[in-house]
Amino acid sequence: MLRAWAAILVVASVLLGCGSDDPESRPADAAQLKGAPPPIAALHRQGNELLDGGPEAFEQRLRELKGYPVVVNKWASWCPPCRAEFPYFQNQAAKRAKKVAFIGVDSNDNDDDAREFLAEYPVPYPSYKDPSLEVAAVFKGQLAFPTTAFYDSKGELAYVKQGGYRDEADLVADIERYAR
């Protein structure tokens, strides 16, 4: 009987996420997000959600964010390089929550797998559903997984990186270079 209770406690701890004190594995907390300007705060309110609307809704969101730099990350739950770099985006979105807008684009994926992925890697910004790469075409990101696009504060597409980031320092360098 004691073994059964021990097994139940272990399973409960895993399901509740207990035991991980690694700050890199935790989503942004409210204190990090508090004080963001209204257009970026609107993204935070939709954090970790999958949004419909296609390229029209995505382009409207970009227009709403004019005046702020924007980082767009195209990903898919089945993409190993996307999984490898996603913690970098989690971390940078939290660190830059008041100055840089982040948006995800979930391409060529199904909703259940995407939601499972976001449950594993929660982010303080939404992702637009893009089953046919129409949203990715807005930022010329149809070819590679992952792809990251950088918009400057004027709303101009400044740079598109095809392929994944090997380390967070490279992402930081691109954010500082292009998302201004």
Model regions and ranges:
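N-terminal targeting signals for export/organelle localization
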Residues: 1-52, 173, 180
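Hydrophobic beta-strand anchors of alpha/beta hydrolase catalytic cores
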Residues: 71-72, 102, 148
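Structural microenvironment flanking redox-active thiols in thiol-disulfide oxidoreductases
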Residues: 83-121, 131-138
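A short beta-strand-turn-helix
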Residues: 46-70
